[in-house]
Amino acid sequence: METYILSIDQGTTSSRAILFNKEGKIVHSAQKEFTQHFPQPGWVEHNANEIWGSVLAVIATVISESGISADQIAGIGITNQRETTVVWDKDTGKPVYNAIVWQSRQTSGICEELREKGYNDTFREKTGLLIDPYFSGTKVKWILDNVEGAREKAENGNLLFGTIDSWLIWKMSGGAAHVTDYSNASRTLMFNIHELKWDDELLDILGVPKSMLPEVKPSSHVYAKTVDYHFFGKNIPIAGAAGDQQSALFGQACFEEGMGKNTYGTGCFMLMNTGEKAITSDHGLLTTIAWGLDGKVEYALEGSIFVAGSAIQWLRDGMRMFQDSKESETYAERVDSADGVYVVPAFVGLGTPYWDSDVRGSVFGLTRGTTKEHFIRATLESLAYQAKDVLDAMEADSGISLKTLRVDGGAVKNNFLMQFQSDLLDVPVERPEINETTALGAAYLAGIAVGYWKDSTEIADQWNLDKQFKPEMEDEKRDELYGGWKKAVNAAMAFK
């Protein structure tokens, strides 16, 4: 009987279930969107029970449509939107409030207060993160402070906190396991990434009772088994978990120090494996745990770019320059260059290495000869310039030069962008055969835990190249183009 690994990819707008075989190939997949709630400007929330319902639905769809039986599933891996926060009642299993999403800015006031009290360095040194509404810690505090009766219940040990992985494992196991993995714990602003434990001082500052927190386990580990009433009468090992970006790093087989990947989604997330060293950044990068595996923890440096694929959507929907995103490549290739035009797509501020939330999008270098093609090309090029900003910061912090960049996400199908990215970084850019690297990473972590795959060496051998883009640009040209980008960013930041 052939067996498979089931990967649950719980994202910001949809939940997916993907069935992988021994070769790491996709056998079947299903996807279901769920509701986004915006109770106030800048706030983003999800209904945690609706997320759970969407996960059950995609699992059922995959099993029924693929024609397999549940006992052919050797294990389940979970990857999830990171930082999104659920607080629920231990006895009833009901969330006390909506899940507060990573994008939500509703804890800005709490963060401002913590920074004013001088806690920035304390959090940075212990967690590798910045005090920002992005991370879970202030979201938990907000729920305890704003939901009637929540703080009292939490202090009595009746409430549980979890990121989405914890919530799903708790639900799948029928409440038997309240756990998370190292990668997700490292995004909470409450976990000491050096001592590998919840930090009492940080919990005290945030006013979060320790009894709420999940147990932290390796990313490849049998956490629990599914309860039969949720899983076609079967008890299947839930055996792997990792935050989405760390999972993509694993799925890209970036197992050696200095290997890196860039995911081109709505925004971009670039991660570099720094091995067993947690490197503190001087250039606006986050220090994070990549995964816990084989009795050790590995770390990564992470850079966040807020606008990537959404800039192409803006050209399509806002500027109406084309009807299909694929056309952006055709238009960009009709001209030899952007003709001195630079687009700084700071629609929601700039992330790494600038961390400036007040700067807004700008266009520079327009002349009477500027065409639609130049404008589209300049917008695509801005994705690559931002990735170079991040990579330069990573190399400066780590002292490691990247040898190749592995890429995934929607925009990697754009050959023009990938070639320009390689030219600008002066390293080969590698696009894998399987683009679903986030779901694949979770499948691999689960598969190793249940013996479906032997180890990371076997997984590295399965990584297959679709296309490699090699740098063709001369140094002088690269320096000239990137110099123009830096001038454009500085000008945009001055215009407030």
Curated annotation (Swiss-Prot):
Pfam families: FGGY_C, FGGY_N. The keyword Glycoprotein does not apply. The phosphoenolpyruvate-dependent sugar phosphotransferase system (PTS), including enzyme I, and histidine-containing protein (HPr) are required for the phosphorylation, which leads to the activation of the enzyme. InterPro entries: ATPase_NBD, Carb_kinase_FGGY, Carb_kinase_FGGY_CS, FGGY_C, FGGY_N, Glycerol_kin. Its EC number is 2.7.1.30. Sn-glycerol 3-phosphate binds at residues 12, 82-83, 134, 244. Glycerol binds at residues 82-83, 134, 244-245. ATP binds at residues 12-14, 266, 309, 313, 410. Keywords: ATP-binding, Glycerol metabolism, Kinase, Nucleotide-binding, Phosphoprotein, Transferase. GO terms for cellular component: cytosol. PROSITE patterns: FGGY_KINASES_1, FGGY_KINASES_2. GO terms for molecular function: ATP binding; glycerol kinase activity. Activated by phosphorylation and inhibited by fructose 1,6-bisphosphate (FBP). Pathway: Polyol metabolism; glycerol degradation via glycerol kinase pathway; sn-glycerol 3-phosphate from glycerol: step 1/1. It catalyses: glycerol + ATP = sn-glycerol 3-phosphate + ADP + H(+). It is an enzyme of class 2 (transferase). One of its GO terms (biological process) is glycerol metabolic process. It comes from the Bacteria. ADP binds at residues 12, 16, 266, 309, 410, 414. The modification Phosphohistidine is found at residue 230. Key enzyme in the regulation of glycerol uptake and metabolism. Catalyzes the phosphorylation of glycerol to yield sn-glycerol 3-phosphate. Belongs to the FGGY kinase family. Homotetramer and homodimer (in equilibrium). PANTHER family: GLYCEROL KINASE, SUGAR KINASE. This is Glycerol kinase. It comes from Bacillus velezensis (strain DSM 23117 / BGSC 10A6 / LMG 26770 / FZB42) (Bacillus amyloliquefaciens subsp. plantarum). The lineage of its organism: Bacteria, Bacillati, Bacillota, Bacilli, Bacillales.
